[in-house]
Amino acid sequence: MDDLVLARSLFGTTMGFHIIFATLGVGLPLMILVAELIYQKTKDDHYAIMAKRWTKAQAVLLGVAIPTGTIAGTQLALLWPGFMEVIGRVMSLPFQIEIYAFFVEALFMSIYVYAADRLSPAMRIVAVFFVLVGAAASAVLITNVHAFEGTPAGFKILNGKITDVDPWAAFFNPSFFITAGHVVLSAFMTGAFIVASVAAYKMIRTRKKERVYRFHRKALLLALTIGGIFSLLTALNGHESAQMLYEYQPEKLAGAEGLFETRSHAPLAIGGFTDPNEEKVKWAIEIPWALSFLAANRFDTVVKGLNAFPRDEWPPLFIHTLFNAMVGVGMLLILYSIIGVVWRKVLKKDRFPTWLLIIFMTAGPFSLIGIEFGWIFACTGRQPWVIYHLLKTSDVVTTTGSIGVLFLFFTFVYAVLGAAVVYVLLYYFRKHPVDEDLNTAES
């Protein structure tokens, strides 16, 4: 493999691993904050216990997110020196501000973990709130660099030189707010569904322990409710993202929908696989006129097809499958939430059948898969550009050798880290079962 493929594989693996912990690092604090708020309002000890236990998991995940994020930053400089030269001169603000966001998160996380029992109820909520603010701000700031890659602003390249630099224009690039909303909303969704998966699993294991079962049922319903809300909000934001693609990255939208010919009243292709030879999406379900309407809220909107662009600037055509998988996961998770809430609140069922709990157990893995598909779609769909229509990925890759060795090394490191996280979480929660916390709360 050439250096470009190896460099993209290495950095893609790093980001694919890091994004799991970064996403949960934003999503779990919201769950902790909501549990704290419910506890302070109702004085139901179950919610205080939820907040306490989820905080332990958050601490472990944060401990992995920090080094993997550092590795990702280092690899940016090592693998993409030409890209970082532009970022250093034009888009350094997010990295600088993110340092403060990280310190806010780390400071208040330490306060909440080590001094929660000595804080007043109001200060407990304040501490968790700033953990959430710091985590969300970090995610938004770093993801803003990705937004800048797709909708660059605040500089020009003339005769190979960077001129007319405006850091704030680069920071508030056209897709900043939409991208920021998408990353935060999807992180909240994922954090909730991970909790739902664990709660569903524990409900299956504790069917004969009524007190523990009720505790996990509350956690499940809370998680499904929050997950459902943010799944819906993520979907609405995704619609805005598609309209942004229509305006700023039309070939990416065409690739996502498998549209080859420019046309009005363009259909929306659901499912299927893009065939580059026949220039169509095979075995797809087409909804007439829907793509034109989704692109600009008019059925007669003209949507550019791939053939309107040079073939060497087409994104990989498999992004149609990634896009459909991402959307499909989101719709499935909304359905999960509706079923769970209806079963408990409308049908008034005290017990969930095992088959339904098994389905709910898949919510967390599906949400993470959706995050991964979305991230790969966002980055791969921008190719061959690293900065859209200004700088190609192949022009900024390092010429240093040994990338293959680094790829194998870091893959091994991530496997070890992943196994260590699973081991530590299982070890801690087996040593500290819910029964102990419930007994302490009742004594």
From Swiss-Prot:
Disruption phenotype: Not essential. It is a multi-pass membrane protein. The chain crosses the membrane at residues 19-39, 60-80, 93-113, 125-145, 176-196, 219-239, 322-342, 357-377, 405-425. InterPro entries: Cyt-d_ubiquinol_oxidase_su_1. Binds 1 protoheme IX group (heme b). Heme b binds at residue 182. Its cofactor is heme b. It is found in: Cell membrane. Belongs to the cytochrome ubiquinol oxidase subunit 1 family. This is Putative cytochrome bd menaquinol oxidase subunit I. It comes from Bacillus subtilis (strain 168). The lineage of its organism: Bacteria, Bacillati, Bacillota, Bacilli, Bacillales.
